[in-house]
A protein has these predicted regions:
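Catalytic-loop region of hydrolases
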Residues: 36-112
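Conserved alpha/beta-hydrolase
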Residues: 137, 143-164
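C-terminal motif of bacterial Sec signal peptides marking the signal peptidase cleavage site
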Residues: 30-32
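Accessory cap/linker subdomain of secreted extracellular hydrolases
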Residues: 239-346
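Primarily recognizes the serine-hydrolase "nucleophile elbow" in alpha/beta-hydrolase
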Residues: 187-258
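Bacterial N-terminal signal peptides that target proteins for export
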Residues: 10-22
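Alpha/beta-hydrolase active-site loop
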Residues: 172-195
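Short, surface-exposed "cap/lid" segments of acyl-processing enzymes
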Residues: 95-100, 108-146
Length: 347
């Protein structure tokens, strides 16, 4: 029975995600520019290295989407084989220091004048799910290859904390680093295209993201629109976003007795901010035992799957958070947390 429930849940999630992907693809074809306005010279020197990984065949994508995911309509978007490349590029860490990050680039084979698309990935717990790692044949990279097969060159940033930076904690829902890692991935991608003499069409880049990727997409859009950029955002599509972190945090703490869709996400968020902003209180002031010990022992170090992480956390927020933390927050006594959250609000 348990396996059947999990299978149904996965099918429902695949259906929901495919419907969002299908709508996004239709918008891409409808709204994308068609004029060829390639950049003559890269403005930023960010690309460090590139490596060809593999080619994803149309038949493999059709097997995944039509057979495994049960989405026969996906076949109409699968028009090209897709070459997958891993790249390493320069970006900034949480302290503004230079650091090498990684990502994947998906190039449709023999596609005439493909458009540009950057996909910011959703919340992940395992480094194996990072785009450049591409650990399994049915990986997230394989799933996103449908966008490239439809006729787009796709940039997939890992974010900090994954790929070549997997030895460091991921700054979860952190505006500055999500925006910079995604933006610098695009800059490195443009250099990659020029170095490999790959032509593309348009003077803008479409941006999409789901869950944490939706937050990253809006942060990236803001960065591109307010700072120097050789490209401007074209279509911007976001699914299941949380932009107003302060209001979301208020709601969560005021409704800790209500069912939570992703307890692990809230634990990840609080642990990440505790690390980024060096909160003065120990984790045990926020999380009940034994969850505080599990988090301190590396629950979010990228070595475990989402199911493994979830199995080590409670099902309710009241079990996760200490009563003293909840009371402090309600009394307006969590200045460090509230300040950090407000700094990352996007609305």
């Amino acid at each position: 029975m348990g396996n059947q429930v999990v299978h149904r849940e996965r099918q429902m999630e695949s259906m929901k995600y495919f419907k969002w992907q299908a709508l996004t693809l239709l918008l891409l074809f409808t709204l994308s520019c068609s004029d060829n306005n390639n950049i003559d010279e890269p403005v930023f020197e960010t690309l460090v290295s590139e490596d060809f990984n593999r080619t994803i065949l149309q038949s493999s994508m059709e097997f995944f989407w039509v057979t495994l995911a049960g989405q026969p309509d996906a076949a109409s978007y699968i028009n090209h084989d897709v070459d997958v490349y891993r790249i390493i590029y320069q970006t900034k860490d949480i302290n503004g220091n230079s650091i090498e990050a990684s990502g994947a680039i998906l190039v449709p084979v023999n596609a005439p004048q493909p458009g540009l698309l950057s996909i910011q990935h959703a919340t992940i717990f395992s480094n194996n799910e990072a785009p450049s790692v591409d650990a399994t044949q049915n990986s997230a990279t394989t799933r996103k290859a449908i966008f490239a097969s439809a006729g787009n060159i796709v940039f997939l940033p890992d974010y900090l904390g994954y790929g070549v930076t997997s030895d460091q904690p991921h700054p979860y829902q952190h505006k500055e680093t999500l925006a910079s890692a995604s933006f610098d991935m695009i800059m490195a991608g443009l250099e990659f295209l020029e170095a490999n003499e790959i032509e593309w069409s348009g003077s803008s880049i479409d941006l999409i993201g789901y869950s944490e990727g939706a937050y990253a997409t809006l942060a990236l859009t803001e960065k591109m629109e307010t700072g120097p950029s050789p490209l401007q955002p074209g279509l911007v599509s976001m699914g299941a976003p949380i932009f107003d972190l302060s209001s979301t945090m208020d709601y969560v703490i005021n409704n800790v007795d209500q069912p939570a869709e992703c307890v692990a996400c809230y634990a990840y968020f609080l642990e990440s901010y505790h690390t980024i902003y060096s909160f003065s209180r120990p984790l045990s002031d926020y999380f009940n035992s034994p969850y505080d010990e599990r988090i301190m022992d590396g629950l979010f170090d990228g070595s475990q799957s989402s199911a493994q992480v979830a199995s080590q956390l409670p099902e309710s927020m009241t079990e996760l958070f200490t009563d003293s933390f909840i009371q402090r927050y309600l009394n307006g006594e969590e200045d460090e947390l509230e300040s950090a959250v407000a700094e990352n609000d996007l609305l």
